[in-house]
Amino acid sequence: MTQHSPYSSAIAEQRNQEWLRFVELLRQAYAEDLHLPLLQLMLTPDEREALGTRVRIIEELLRGEMSQRELKTELGAGIATITRGSNSLKSAPVELRHWLEQILLKSA
């Protein structure tokens, strides 16, 4: 059995607070129509591309017409990335999943 040290708990809490700070900053940027410049500042081109790919993965998993292997070929993403997306989608709150279906599959 592994035990987590107070040090690792403190680091995890600090990282969570930093994440929440970023989320609030992004919310404020949207309110002031500065979200695109903020995201371009905060994310590298590769990170922005990876986020776009993840959206496509979630979209296709929700659509349910392709296997994970087909998604790998279609999107050029690693099977581990697709599997993580699938597992995350399975554990997502029902409300979020329904919202994603409405937003991502509305043109389907």
Curated annotation (Swiss-Prot):
List the record's Gene Ontology CC terms alphabetically: cytoplasm
Describe the function of this protein: This protein is an aporepressor. When complexed with L-tryptophan it binds the operator region of the trp operon (5'-ACTAGT-'3') and prevents the initiation of transcription. The complex also regulates trp repressor biosynthesis by binding to its regulatory region.
Can you tell me which family this protein belongs to? Belongs to the TrpR family.
Q: Describe the protein's quaternary organization and the partners it interacts with.
A: Homodimer.
- Which Gene3D superfamilies has this protein been placed in? TrpR-like
- Molecular-function GO terms, alphabetical: DNA-binding transcription factor activity; sequence-specific DNA binding
Give the location in the cell. Cytoplasm
Q: Which PANTHER family match?
A: TRP OPERON REPRESSOR
Q: Which organism is it from?
A: Salmonella paratyphi A (strain AKU_12601)
Database matches in SUPFAM superfamilies = TrpR-like
Q: Which residues bind DNA?
A: 68-91
Give the organism's phylogenetic lineage: Bacteria, Pseudomonadati, Pseudomonadota, Gammaproteobacteria, Enterobacterales
Is Transcription regulation set as a keyword in this record?
Answer: yes
* UniProt name for this protein: Trp operon repressor
